[in-house]
C-alpha cells in the first residue's frame, strides 16, 4: 500500500486520458489544481498545457517557466493549490522515466497516463522523494466530482 493517496474524480481522469489521446503520438502535459490539507490531497481542476519540447515530443515533454507561473497564478486566483503535473507516455508504460525524475520536483504529485496506439491503458501517480533519488507510488482514489467550484 502506498504512503500517499491522490483523490481525483473519474471525470478528471477521463479528461487526462482524452488529452493524451488528442496529442498522440506526442506526450501531453498539464497541471493538477486542487487542495492539499488535513483531509488529503485532491485534484479538483486540470490546466492543460502545451508540450514545448521541440526535439523529441514523442518521448519527452517540457513545461516552460512561463507556464509554471501561469498555472500557479491560476490556482491562486481560484483559491486552489498547484498540487502536481500530469503527462502521457505514448506506447510506453505509465512509469516515470529517468528523464522524468531528473526534471521533477519533490512534494508534487505526478500523474502519468499510458496511451497505447491511441488508446488509454493505464494511469498512475507518483511523488518524488525529497532527496530526488526515486519516486514513491501514490495511490489514486476515485471521488465524486465537486460542483460549484
Regions found by a protein language model. Give the residues of each.
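Conserved beta-strand-loop surface patch within small alpha/beta domains used
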Residues: 1-82, 90-149
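Conserved, mostly hydrophobic/aromatic
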Residues: 85
Amino acid at each position: 500500500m502506498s504512503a500517499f493517496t491522490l483523490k481525483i474524480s473519474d471525470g478528471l481522469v477521463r479528461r487526462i486520458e482524452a488529452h493524451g489521446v488528442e496529442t498522440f503520438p506526442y506526450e501531453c502535459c498539464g497541471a493538477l489544481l486542487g487542495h492539499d490539507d488535513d483531509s488529503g490531497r485532491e485534484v479538483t481542476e486540470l490546466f492543460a498545457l502545451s508540450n514545448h519540447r521541440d526535439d523529441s515530443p514523442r518521448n519527452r515533454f517540457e513545461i516552460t517557466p512561463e507556464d509554471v507561473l501561469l498555472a500557479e497564478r491560476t490556482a491562486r486566483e481560484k483559491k486552489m493549490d498547484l498540487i502536481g503535473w500530469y503527462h502521457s507516455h505514448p506506447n510506453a508504460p505509465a512509469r516515470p522515466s529517468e528523464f522524468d525524475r531528473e526534471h521533477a520536483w519533490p512534494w508534487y504529485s505526478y500523474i502519468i497516463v499510458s496511451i497505447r496506439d491511441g488508446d488509454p491503458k493505464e494511469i498512475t501517480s507518483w511523488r518524488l522523494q525529497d532527496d530526488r533519488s526515486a519516486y514513491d507510488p501514490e495511490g489514486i482514489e476515485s471521488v465524486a466530482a465537486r460542483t460549484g467550484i
